[in-house]
C-alpha cells in the first residue's frame, strides 16, 4: 500500500554510468512485479526518474495526495488498519504474497490451510473461555 504526492519521485539509478551496478536488494524483481516488464525495463535501463502522477498511472503507488498531506494520510490509513484483526491481515498478506509465485490452485490450497488453522485457533480459544467461565 503506497501513498505519494505529485511531487514525489521514484528512481532506480543503478544503470547510470557513475554507478554501473544493479539494485542489490530485490529492486528489479519487486518493480517488475508491480509495474510490469516493459515499464520496469524503461525505469531500470534508463535510470529515469518518474513523478507521483506517472507512478500512480503505472500502479507503483495506490494513492496520490497533496505533498503536505502524505504523512497525515499515511498515519490515518495505518490507524484504520490497526483497528482490524492483525492476525487476519498477516495471513491475508501471506496469501497475497504466495499468490505472486504460485498458480491459482496452489494459492487456494494455501489459503484454505491458513483459514482452517485460524478456525481451529478460534474454536480452541472459544472452548477455553467457555471452560473457564
Set out the residue ranges of the language-model regions.
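Well-ordered beta-strand positions
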Residues: 1, 42, 46-48, 54, ...
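C-terminal alpha-helix plus adjacent terminal tail
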Residues: 47-53, 68-133
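CoA-thioester-processing core
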Residues: 1-43, 58, 73, 77
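Residue-identity detector for threonine
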Residues: 7, 28, 32, 54, ...
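Aromatic-glycine-rich donor-binding/catalytic loop that engages nucleotide-sugar donors
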Residues: 58-60, 100
Amino acid at each position: 500500500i503506497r501513498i505519494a504526492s505529485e511531487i514525489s519521485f521514484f528512481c532506480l539509478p543503478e544503470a547510470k554510468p557513475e554507478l554501473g551496478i544493479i539494485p542489490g536488494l530485490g529492486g528489479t524483481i519487486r518493480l517488475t512485479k508491480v509495474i510490469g516488464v516493459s515499464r520496469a525495463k524503461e525505469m531500470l535501463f534508463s535510470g529515469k526518474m518518474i513523478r507521483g502522477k506517472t507512478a500512480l498511472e503505472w500502479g507503483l503507488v495506490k494513492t496520490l495526495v497533496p505533498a503536505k498531506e502524505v504523512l497525515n494520510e499515511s498515519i490515518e490509513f495505518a490507524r484504520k488498519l490497526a483497528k482490524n484483526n492483525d492476525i487476519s491481515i498477516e495471513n491475508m498478506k501471506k496469501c497475497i504474497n504466495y499468490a505472486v509465485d504460485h498458480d491459482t490452485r496452489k494459492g487456494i490450497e494455501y489459503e484454505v490451510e491458513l483459514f482452517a488453522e485460524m478456525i481451529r485457533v478460534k474454536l480452541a480459544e472459544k472452548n477455553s473461555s467457555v471452560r473457564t467461565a
